[in-house]
């Protein structure tokens, strides 16, 4: 597998206070991912891998097929967006990972997802 510059991934996270319970060490975050296909041919997302790290350094790995129950085809010049969630035990944490994808010819490649922060807004100065 190779990393491909043909696909761009952007992530934005938000704290979900209404579903969180700090007294029970439960902090809920939603994250919205936008995947843009900058190439000249269609690609398909087959799988995902996430490394979720809480504020104590405890790591959780999550992997599986597709995202939110789909294995989307993303046309040349197109984009795919989805929202999912993560629950951690601390008010600060991070996520990072990669997507396993194939191009129109079935050749596999990997798209790295850079680290992004999960943070309760009142903790960020």
UniProtKB/Swiss-Prot annotation:
SUPFAM superfamilies recorded: ApaG-like
Domain of life: Bacteria
GO biological process: error-free translesion synthesis
Matching InterPro entries: ApaG_domain, ApaG_sf, Uncharacterised_ApaG
Sequence ranges assigned to domain ApaG in this UniProt record: 1-125
Gene3D superfamilies attached to this UniProt entry: ApaG domain
Pfam family, one: DUF525
Protein name per UniProt: Protein ApaG
Organism: Klebsiella pneumoniae (strain 342)
Gene designation per UniProt: apaG
């Amino acid at each position: 597998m190779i990393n491909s510059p043909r696909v761009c991934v952007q992530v934005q996270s938000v704290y979900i206070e209404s579903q969180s319970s700090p007294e029970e060490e439960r902090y809920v975050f939603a994250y919205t991912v936008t995947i843009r296909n900058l190439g000249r041919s269609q690609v398909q997302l087959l799988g995902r891998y996430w490394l979720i790290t809480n504020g104590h350094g405890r790591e959780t790995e999550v992997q599986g097929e597709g995202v939110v129950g789909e294995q989307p085809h993303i046309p040349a010049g197109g984009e795919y967006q989805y929202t999912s969630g993560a629950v951690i035990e601390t008010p600060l944490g991070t996520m990072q990972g990669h997507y396993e994808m194939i191009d129109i010819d079935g050749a596999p490649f990997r798209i790295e997802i850079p680290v992004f922060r999960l943070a309760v807004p009142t903790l960020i100065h």
